Amino acid sequence: MTHPVISLKPSYNSVIRGCPGLPDTLPRIECQLRVRSNNSLPFKLVKIEIVLKTIEIYFNKNLYSSNNSSFTPFNRPSDPSNGHSDTSNQNISIHYKKNIVLSHPTHDGDDLNNDLIGIDIPLTIGLPDDIKETNYNPKFGKTQTFLDCTVFYTEVGGGSSNKKRNFLYPVNVERYTYLPSPSYFRPINRSNITSPDQKFLISYSIENPCVSMNNDTLKLSISIRLNPFPNNATTPSSNDFDVSTPTLFSTKKKFKSKLKLKSITTQILEYLEILKNQSEFSSTQTTNILQTSVRQVDQIISMNSMIFQFNLKIFTKDKILQSFRSSESSCPETKVLINKIDDIPLQYHSSITTIGQHFNVSHYLSIRFKFNKSLKNFEINHPLIISFWSVSQLPLIENLILQERQTAKFAKKFYKNFGRIKNTSNNNNSSNCLEYPSLPPIIYNFNDPETNNRFNILYSQKDPSRTDPSKLRRVPVIQ
């Protein structure tokens, strides 16, 4: 039975050109949609529907139990990819939708005017500025983008009822907005922050507030001392940053405290924020602790600052990949990866900072101070960004961005010959998206000598008129 076979041919190594997240690079999908007859016999093309969509799924809190093995998220029976609605919430964002219909017959005045054996359609689809990157977070959810192509057709001589064939192609989106470089994210310095009871002054600095998910180091410096003017304010305010430094002759009795700083605990946390309505995310956040580090201090706090330096190792890839970062000379244990979830490659299985239409995943650094008097304990939180890219990739990425910006200039000139690139607004949200002009397709007519020669289609001739397909038999050709 004759039916169309659908495939995609990327224009380059990837279907994505430009750098998603950087509008001046014209992030877009460039590929060729190929529709071919499965047996070189004709079919009638009705229309082709093309949809670009992003699917966001966040997991329920109790989706993963605490007794999961180290092989999670692989082969988990309760994974939402099996389609159970009780374990996930799903949102679909449509970025692009278009119906393609042949407006001119392929053979004028002939009964075979819609009989094809193939068609090639160049596709250029602009990616919206806020498109979400491909990611699988084992705790919170996953995000995927698909190019969904459906061909509606009828068989030649097989009646007028339409049939359809579908082709779903995953598009792995990587955003270039968060790069772990001082050029993009400068060091953070916070000075003279008062504790909730106004007894302490804390200063901290973060050298690299944007870190990589892949074995990066977060450099943190903390200093703490007694507040010389604890009664100047009853609640923390912006004036806390202007507290003057005490002199060497400060000998008031209230500073002769025996308060001990027992320990400093640092944690890397990830938060899940779910969209509550069209303009507001949920106020209640689901928290997950990625890693914890405790430093024992056990020292008396005085007017002199106590300074602590931290080098926190960051690795938020999936647990199954952590065994490959061992520096031991022994051969690591062999582990078999049986499958992957919904065709999401392993490099996207990690906890990174993402912003989407349905849910966000953000990260924070938590600094907890524990004293010998429990009422004095307090905590400081500071937002972090965990990037998909590693520090070693930065030179290559920066070079790629420069190349894509240059290519975008030539692309604008090219598409100007077929019309102009238009700015459009997505109907589902306020994101900006570019609409590219349509490029002419290549149509492969049935029984066309040039087409037969192109695809090495040879027939044993039983009908001299070559008009009855039932009397034609394809001769197999070994290539």
Swiss-Prot record:
User: Got a GO cellular component term for this one?
Assistant: cellular bud neck
Q: Which biological processes are named by the entry's GO terms?
A: division septum assembly; protein localization to bud neck
Disulphides: none
Task: Describe the outcome of a gene knockout.
Answer: Impairs the efficient localization of TUS1 to the bud neck at late anaphase.
Region annotation (Disordered) ranges: 460-479
State any further remark. Answer: Present with 396 molecules/cell in log phase SD medium.
Function of the molecule: Regulator of RHO1 signaling that acts as a cofactor required for the efficient localization of the TUS1 GTP exchange factor (GEF) for RHO1 to the bud neck during all phases of cytokinesis. RHO1 is a key, essential hub protein in the cell wall integrity (CWI) pathway in which activated RHO1-GTP binds directly to and activates multiple different downstream effectors required for cell wall synthesis and actin assembly during cytokinesis.
User: What name does this protein carry?
Assistant: RHO1 GEF localizing protein 1
According to its UniProt entry, this protein's organism is Saccharomyces cerevisiae (strain ATCC 204508 / S288c) (Baker's yeast)
Q: From which lineage does this chain's organism come? A: Eukaryota, Fungi, Dikarya, Ascomycota, Saccharomycotina
